[in-house]
């Protein structure tokens, strides 16, 4: 049998789950009295931890990985050390596929957990120049394909001689930092490269325990109309230590497309 959990998050951010993050009991007591009890009880009854118990436990644990930093008003430095040890002691008892199946756990957190679960800072960075991708390879699995991180398009403005395109690209900071972000524009047999201006978005930084794991890079690109003649294909890429990474996960924000005069541009 399979099960899934549906949680309705409140936009006001005052749900029981959000409130729990400001209480010591959610970090230590819950792990001690529920998580480890469930794991130990399963091993005692069945000799091993069934998948459904692991999934239930991991679903509960994933919220702890979404806390950017634990305030000292909630846990003392000593208590935080105890909590982190307990957290990973629990995760080490969860099978890899259960962790990777979590829908609400980000790609960077999944790789971060694996890099510690397998061995501290483990995982070998691999590049595939043919598919223009990179990932971290472990003895029995791979995680964090760079091409699958989210690319957002927020606006497109028609100017007199150019198109101004704006968006944001998510970067996992375990990869080498981008040397540049660029558009690859292909029309027929002709390809142009357009460099983007980019900077980190301070409002979209993803952390765990104070460590910065990923960021969104806000970018702008100016594309001359002369690059468009017939069917034109635009790819969003970045330079990762001399290797090209091409994004495959495109998300149009609600602001995109924008009306310009009597025209509206649509991204196919």
Cite the ranges covered by each PLM segment:
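Active-site-proximal helix/loop capping residues that flank conserved catalytic or ligand/cofactor
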Residues: 5, 36, 58-59, 85
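Nucleotide-sugar-dependent glycosyltransferase catalytic core
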Residues: 2-34, 48, 67-80
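Conserved, well-structured beta-alpha core segment at the onset of a catalytic domain
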Residues: 33-55, 67-73, 175-177
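Basic, ligand-binding patches in group-transfer machinery
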Residues: 57, 68-75, 83-268
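Amphipathic alpha-helical protein-interaction segments enriched in hydrophobic
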Residues: 50-63, 107-108
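Short, solvent-exposed segments of well-ordered alpha helices
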Residues: 22-25, 48, 52-55, 150-157
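Amphipathic alpha-helices of TPR/Sel1-like and other helical repeat/solenoid scaffolds
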Residues: 30-44, 80-93
